[in-house]
C-alpha cells in the first residue's frame, strides 16, 4: 500500500469533513466507530455505534439494546435512548419515548416501561429517566437523529415531564 492508498479498498474520507476524516483514520487504519463482539468461532456481531454506548458506573450499555427491549411494548411508536450526565455514575440511560396514537403519557405508563426493562435486562441497563415526547427528529430514512433531540446546553433531566427512576435501579439476585 502506498501513502495515497492506505489499506486499499476503504474510502479515502468524508466529503467536506476534514476533521471527521482525520479522527476516523489512525495509523493507516480506518476506524468505523462500530462496537462489536466476537464469539468463540470468530464470528463478529454488531452491538452499536461507539457513540451510542452509554457508560454507567464502569458498565457499557448499548442504547440499541435498551431501545429494542422497550420496543417490545406495543404502545411504543418511536424511541431513542441517550446518555445523560450523572454526578455519581458518570452517565445514566434516558429513554425518549413517542407513544402510539391514543396512548396517554402518565407515570403509570412510564412505570410499565421501566419495569419491563428491569425485568428483561440487567438492572443497570434500565432507563433511569423516561421522557415522553410528541416526536423525535429523524432522517429521510426514518432513523432517529439523537444529537438533534436536545440542544447541547439543555440538561434533559431537568425538563418538565421527566420521570426519574434512578432510585429504583437496584441489583437483583441474578445480576
Can you describe what each PLM-predicted range is?
Residues 151-175:
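Acidic/polar alpha-helix N-cap and adjacent early helical turns
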Residues 28:
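A structured beta-alpha segment of the ubiquitous adenosine-cofactor-binding alpha/beta core
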Residues 143-144, 175:
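A general structural signal for short secondary-structure boundary/capping elements
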Residues 2-8, 12-13, 20-23, 35-125, ...:
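AMP-binding/adenylate-forming catalytic core of the ANL superfamily
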